[in-house]
Amino acid sequence: MTPEEYCQQKAASSGSSFYYSFLFLPPNRRRAITALYAYCREVDDVVDECLDPQIAATKLVWWRTELDRLYAGKPEHPVTQALLPVLKEFALPQEQLLEIIDGMEMDLQQTRYLDFKALSLYCYRVASVVGLLAAEIFGYTDRATQKYAHDLGMAFQLTNIIRDVGEDARRGRVYLPIDELQRFNVPVADILNSRYSDNFKALMEFQIERAEQYYAQAMSQLPAADRKAQRPGLVMAAIYRAVLNEIKRDGCQVLSQRTSLTPIRKLWIAWRTWAKG
Protein backbone atom coordinates (compact mmCIF):
# COMPACT_ATOMS: atom_id res chain seq x y z
CA MET A 1 0.00 0.00 0.00
CA THR A 2 1.41 3.39 -0.98
CA PRO A 3 1.37 6.35 1.44
CA GLU A 4 -1.35 7.98 -0.70
CA GLU A 5 -3.48 4.82 -0.58
CA TYR A 6 -3.02 4.64 3.20
CA CYS A 7 -4.29 8.21 3.57
CA GLN A 8 -7.20 7.60 1.22
CA GLN A 9 -8.22 4.54 3.23
CA LYS A 10 -7.93 6.51 6.47
CA ALA A 11 -10.16 9.28 5.11
CA ALA A 12 -12.78 7.02 3.53
CA SER A 13 -13.06 4.61 6.47
CA SER A 14 -13.69 7.41 8.97
CA GLY A 15 -17.09 8.20 7.47
CA SER A 16 -16.37 11.86 8.17
CA SER A 17 -18.09 14.70 6.38
CA PHE A 18 -14.63 15.94 5.42
CA TYR A 19 -14.34 13.10 2.91
CA TYR A 20 -17.33 14.38 0.94
CA SER A 21 -15.85 17.86 0.69
CA PHE A 22 -12.74 16.47 -1.06
CA LEU A 23 -14.53 14.58 -3.82
CA PHE A 24 -14.66 17.31 -6.45
CA LEU A 25 -11.16 18.73 -5.99
CA PRO A 26 -8.47 18.45 -8.67
CA PRO A 27 -6.15 15.46 -8.00
CA ASN A 28 -3.17 17.35 -6.55
CA ARG A 29 -5.27 19.28 -4.03
CA ARG A 30 -7.35 16.21 -3.21
CA ARG A 31 -4.20 14.20 -2.42
CA ALA A 32 -2.87 17.08 -0.30
CA ILE A 33 -6.01 17.61 1.78
CA THR A 34 -6.47 13.85 2.20
CA ALA A 35 -2.93 13.59 3.59
CA LEU A 36 -3.60 16.49 5.98
CA TYR A 37 -6.87 14.92 7.11
CA ALA A 38 -5.16 11.54 7.63
CA TYR A 39 -2.55 13.25 9.82
CA CYS A 40 -5.31 14.83 11.93
CA ARG A 41 -7.03 11.45 12.25
CA GLU A 42 -3.80 9.73 13.32
CA VAL A 43 -3.06 12.12 16.18
CA ASP A 44 -6.72 12.29 17.20
CA ASP A 45 -6.92 8.48 17.31
CA VAL A 46 -3.98 8.45 19.74
CA VAL A 47 -6.15 10.22 22.32
CA ASP A 48 -9.41 8.46 21.48
CA GLU A 49 -8.06 4.91 21.34
CA CYS A 50 -5.34 4.84 24.04
CA LEU A 51 -6.85 4.00 27.42
CA ASP A 52 -3.61 4.85 29.24
CA PRO A 53 -2.94 8.63 29.13
CA GLN A 54 0.81 8.08 29.62
CA ILE A 55 0.99 5.84 26.57
CA ALA A 56 -1.02 8.39 24.58
CA ALA A 57 1.33 11.17 25.69
CA THR A 58 4.34 9.09 24.61
CA LYS A 59 2.78 8.50 21.20
CA LEU A 60 2.16 12.22 20.75
CA VAL A 61 5.83 12.86 21.57
CA TRP A 62 6.66 10.38 18.80
CA TRP A 63 4.50 12.39 16.39
CA ARG A 64 6.33 15.59 17.35
CA THR A 65 9.62 13.88 16.52
CA GLU A 66 8.12 12.55 13.30
CA LEU A 67 7.25 16.10 12.26
CA ASP A 68 10.91 17.03 12.77
CA ARG A 69 11.83 14.12 10.50
CA LEU A 70 9.21 15.23 7.97
CA TYR A 71 10.58 18.76 7.76
CA ALA A 72 14.09 17.31 7.48
CA GLY A 73 12.88 15.31 4.47
CA LYS A 74 13.08 11.91 6.21
CA PRO A 75 9.54 10.90 7.30
CA GLU A 76 8.91 7.32 8.48
CA HIS A 77 5.10 7.08 8.75
CA PRO A 78 2.91 6.63 5.62
CA VAL A 79 0.95 9.78 6.49
CA THR A 80 4.03 11.98 6.79
CA GLN A 81 5.48 10.37 3.68
CA ALA A 82 2.31 11.45 1.87
CA LEU A 83 2.65 14.93 3.40
CA LEU A 84 6.23 15.44 2.19
CA PRO A 85 5.32 16.58 -1.36
CA VAL A 86 2.44 18.60 0.10
CA LEU A 87 4.86 20.69 2.18
CA LYS A 88 6.87 21.50 -0.91
CA GLU A 89 3.84 22.46 -3.00
CA PHE A 90 1.80 24.36 -0.41
CA ALA A 91 4.41 25.47 2.18
CA LEU A 92 2.51 24.27 5.25
CA PRO A 93 4.20 25.57 8.43
CA GLN A 94 5.42 23.01 10.96
CA GLU A 95 4.22 25.22 13.82
CA GLN A 96 0.60 24.72 12.79
CA LEU A 97 0.93 20.93 12.50
CA LEU A 98 2.47 20.99 15.99
CA GLU A 99 -0.43 23.09 17.32
CA ILE A 100 -2.81 20.27 16.38
CA ILE A 101 -0.79 17.98 18.66
CA ASP A 102 -0.96 20.69 21.36
CA GLY A 103 -4.75 20.45 21.10
CA MET A 104 -4.68 16.67 21.46
CA GLU A 105 -2.50 17.02 24.55
CA MET A 106 -5.15 19.28 26.07
CA ASP A 107 -7.51 16.30 25.87
CA LEU A 108 -5.05 14.30 27.96
CA GLN A 109 -4.60 17.05 30.53
CA GLN A 110 -8.15 18.29 31.16
CA THR A 111 -11.76 17.16 30.86
CA ARG A 112 -13.46 20.48 31.74
CA TYR A 113 -13.24 24.09 30.51
CA LEU A 114 -13.91 26.99 32.86
CA ASP A 115 -15.26 29.41 30.25
CA PHE A 116 -15.58 29.96 26.51
CA LYS A 117 -12.19 31.69 26.35
CA ALA A 118 -10.52 28.51 27.58
CA LEU A 119 -12.59 26.37 25.22
CA SER A 120 -11.74 28.69 22.32
CA LEU A 121 -8.03 27.87 22.65
CA TYR A 122 -8.83 24.17 22.38
CA CYS A 123 -11.09 24.77 19.36
CA TYR A 124 -8.40 26.87 17.72
CA ARG A 125 -5.78 24.17 18.08
CA VAL A 126 -7.85 21.18 16.97
CA ALA A 127 -10.00 22.87 14.32
CA SER A 128 -9.17 26.46 13.34
CA VAL A 129 -5.54 25.53 12.66
CA VAL A 130 -6.78 22.73 10.41
CA GLY A 131 -8.96 25.26 8.62
CA LEU A 132 -6.00 27.57 8.08
CA LEU A 133 -3.89 24.72 6.69
CA ALA A 134 -6.74 23.60 4.45
CA ALA A 135 -7.18 27.15 3.13
CA GLU A 136 -3.53 27.08 2.00
CA ILE A 137 -4.17 23.85 0.09
CA PHE A 138 -7.40 25.05 -1.52
CA GLY A 139 -5.75 28.35 -2.45
CA TYR A 140 -6.65 32.01 -1.94
CA THR A 141 -5.69 35.46 -3.19
CA ASP A 142 -7.06 37.61 -0.34
CA ARG A 143 -5.64 37.27 3.19
CA ALA A 144 -9.13 37.89 4.58
CA THR A 145 -9.78 34.26 3.66
CA GLN A 146 -7.65 33.32 6.67
CA LYS A 147 -10.23 34.95 8.97
CA TYR A 148 -12.95 32.96 7.21
CA ALA A 149 -10.96 29.73 7.68
CA HIS A 150 -10.37 30.46 11.37
CA ASP A 151 -14.04 31.12 12.14
CA LEU A 152 -15.23 28.19 10.05
CA GLY A 153 -12.94 25.90 12.03
CA MET A 154 -14.43 27.28 15.25
CA ALA A 155 -17.94 26.62 13.92
CA PHE A 156 -17.05 23.04 12.98
CA GLN A 157 -15.59 22.24 16.39
CA LEU A 158 -18.50 23.82 18.25
CA THR A 159 -20.82 21.66 16.13
CA ASN A 160 -18.78 18.57 17.04
CA ILE A 161 -19.02 19.45 20.73
CA ILE A 162 -22.80 19.93 20.50
CA ARG A 163 -23.32 16.70 18.56
CA ASP A 164 -21.08 14.63 20.85
CA VAL A 165 -22.18 15.85 24.31
CA GLY A 166 -23.52 12.43 25.33
CA GLU A 167 -20.70 10.43 23.77
CA ASP A 168 -18.06 12.65 25.38
CA ALA A 169 -19.82 12.47 28.75
CA ARG A 170 -19.59 8.68 28.66
CA ARG A 171 -15.82 9.17 28.42
CA GLY A 172 -15.90 11.53 31.39
CA ARG A 173 -15.48 14.65 29.24
CA VAL A 174 -17.64 17.78 29.32
CA TYR A 175 -16.53 20.43 26.85
CA LEU A 176 -19.42 22.81 27.58
CA PRO A 177 -17.96 25.71 29.63
CA ILE A 178 -18.52 25.43 33.37
CA ASP A 179 -19.68 29.05 33.72
CA GLU A 180 -22.36 28.44 31.08
CA LEU A 181 -23.56 25.28 32.83
CA GLN A 182 -23.93 27.39 35.96
CA ARG A 183 -25.71 30.19 34.10
CA PHE A 184 -28.31 27.74 32.76
CA ASN A 185 -28.47 25.84 36.07
CA VAL A 186 -27.35 22.53 34.56
CA PRO A 187 -25.25 20.43 36.99
CA VAL A 188 -22.33 18.56 35.43
CA ALA A 189 -23.80 15.41 37.01
CA ASP A 190 -26.88 15.78 34.79
CA ILE A 191 -24.71 15.60 31.69
CA LEU A 192 -22.56 12.74 32.99
CA ASN A 193 -25.72 10.79 33.89
CA SER A 194 -27.68 11.73 30.74
CA ARG A 195 -30.43 13.58 32.63
CA TYR A 196 -32.37 15.71 30.15
CA SER A 197 -34.18 18.86 31.32
CA ASP A 198 -35.65 22.11 30.03
CA ASN A 199 -32.57 23.88 31.38
CA PHE A 200 -30.32 21.55 29.41
CA LYS A 201 -32.34 22.16 26.25
CA ALA A 202 -31.99 25.94 26.75
CA LEU A 203 -28.24 25.51 27.27
CA MET A 204 -27.93 23.55 24.03
CA GLU A 205 -30.02 26.06 22.09
CA PHE A 206 -27.55 28.71 23.28
CA GLN A 207 -24.63 26.56 22.07
CA ILE A 208 -26.29 26.07 18.68
CA GLU A 209 -26.94 29.79 18.31
CA ARG A 210 -23.26 30.55 18.98
CA ALA A 211 -22.13 27.97 16.43
CA GLU A 212 -24.50 29.51 13.89
CA GLN A 213 -23.00 32.93 14.61
CA TYR A 214 -19.55 31.56 13.78
CA TYR A 215 -20.84 30.09 10.51
CA ALA A 216 -22.44 33.41 9.58
CA GLN A 217 -19.31 35.34 10.56
CA ALA A 218 -17.12 33.01 8.51
CA MET A 219 -19.30 33.34 5.41
CA SER A 220 -19.36 37.13 5.72
CA GLN A 221 -15.55 37.18 5.71
CA LEU A 222 -14.99 34.97 2.65
CA PRO A 223 -13.89 37.24 -0.22
CA ALA A 224 -15.85 36.71 -3.44
CA ALA A 225 -12.59 36.22 -5.33
CA ASP A 226 -11.75 33.14 -3.23
CA ARG A 227 -15.20 31.59 -2.98
CA LYS A 228 -14.66 29.11 -5.82
CA ALA A 229 -11.30 27.91 -4.50
CA GLN A 230 -12.70 27.52 -0.98
CA ARG A 231 -15.73 25.45 -2.03
CA PRO A 232 -14.65 22.40 0.02
CA GLY A 233 -15.15 24.46 3.18
CA LEU A 234 -18.56 25.56 1.94
CA VAL A 235 -19.48 21.90 1.39
CA MET A 236 -18.42 21.07 4.94
CA ALA A 237 -20.36 24.02 6.31
CA ALA A 238 -23.52 22.92 4.48
CA ILE A 239 -23.22 19.38 5.86
CA TYR A 240 -22.45 20.50 9.41
CA ARG A 241 -25.25 23.07 9.44
CA ALA A 242 -27.64 20.34 8.32
CA VAL A 243 -26.53 18.33 11.37
CA LEU A 244 -27.20 21.35 13.62
CA ASN A 245 -30.67 21.71 12.11
CA GLU A 246 -31.39 18.03 12.80
CA ILE A 247 -30.29 18.43 16.41
CA LYS A 248 -32.58 21.45 16.82
CA ARG A 249 -35.46 19.62 15.16
CA ASP A 250 -35.03 16.69 17.55
CA GLY A 251 -35.19 18.95 20.61
CA CYS A 252 -31.45 18.77 21.37
CA GLN A 253 -31.53 15.10 22.39
CA VAL A 254 -27.75 14.90 22.27
CA LEU A 255 -27.37 13.10 25.60
CA SER A 256 -28.90 9.91 24.28
CA GLN A 257 -28.13 10.01 20.56
CA ARG A 258 -25.44 11.16 18.14
CA THR A 259 -27.04 12.91 15.19
CA SER A 260 -25.60 12.08 11.78
CA LEU A 261 -26.59 12.28 8.13
CA THR A 262 -26.76 9.34 5.75
CA PRO A 263 -23.93 9.04 3.19
CA ILE A 264 -26.36 9.68 0.32
CA ARG A 265 -27.61 12.87 1.98
CA LYS A 266 -24.04 14.07 2.55
CA LEU A 267 -23.24 13.34 -1.09
CA TRP A 268 -26.32 15.24 -2.26
CA ILE A 269 -25.47 18.26 -0.09
CA ALA A 270 -21.87 18.13 -1.31
CA TRP A 271 -22.86 18.00 -4.98
CA ARG A 272 -25.50 20.73 -4.62
CA THR A 273 -23.15 23.07 -2.73
CA TRP A 274 -20.28 22.49 -5.16
CA ALA A 275 -22.53 23.09 -8.17
CA LYS A 276 -23.77 26.38 -6.69
CA GLY A 277 -20.16 27.49 -6.28
Question: Where are the regions a protein language model picked out?
Answer:
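Catalytic cores of Mg2+-dependent Asp-rich isoprenoid enzymes
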Residues: 1-157, 162, 166-277
